[in-house]
Amino acid sequence: MKKKIKRIIKQCLSIGRDSINFAAFLVEMIFKNKLHNSFSRRYSGKVAILANGPSLKEVLPKLQMDKFSDTDFIVLNFFGMEAVFTRIKPKHYCLADPMFFHPNHKQKEVRNLFSVLNRNVDWDMNIYTPIGSVDDFKVFSALSNPHIRLVSLNTITYKGFECLRHFFYKHGLSMPLAQTVANMVIYVGTNSGYQQIGLYGVDHTFFDSMCVD
């Protein structure tokens, strides 16, 4: 009986905690005006995510082969400086690092990238940024290319009932923590409607420094 009572109390406390967190999440979402779905345009078929890990070098020469002939691309960071950029014509471009929104030590390289995007993009392309940085990005990038569409992502962190998490993710009202831009591009790929997603250059070194004594 005691175990049953403890279990009931534990469940009640869990429901109470989730209710408070969920209410706080809704209040934050409403007051920060983050009620829009970033993914009003839907896509289908295959998409290849091209991150900037070392293994991408092996893939770059193959991007114009038949394997990728019916594939859309999502790229990130400085991919616009790659020679293959204007040949594969990516539909999606993700930027999450603050260096793309504010003056910084890499400002020269960033300005060069924006110049390339303004000058060379002659196809329709979406650029995705966190919603909190979109105004800074508009000013800092000074992009005026009519082919480029800016899409702001609701980066508010979901809190509350676990069963509702994916509803808010699916409708673009929240997203997983963008600890790396790779998280952002995977989120964009899955929420854009594609049935198949290929990952290239999504490498990490999280465990390289770990060892067992």
For the regions a language model picked out, list residue spans one by one:
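Metal-ion/cofactor- or nucleotide/acyl-coenzyme-handling active-site neighborhoods
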Residues: 2-213
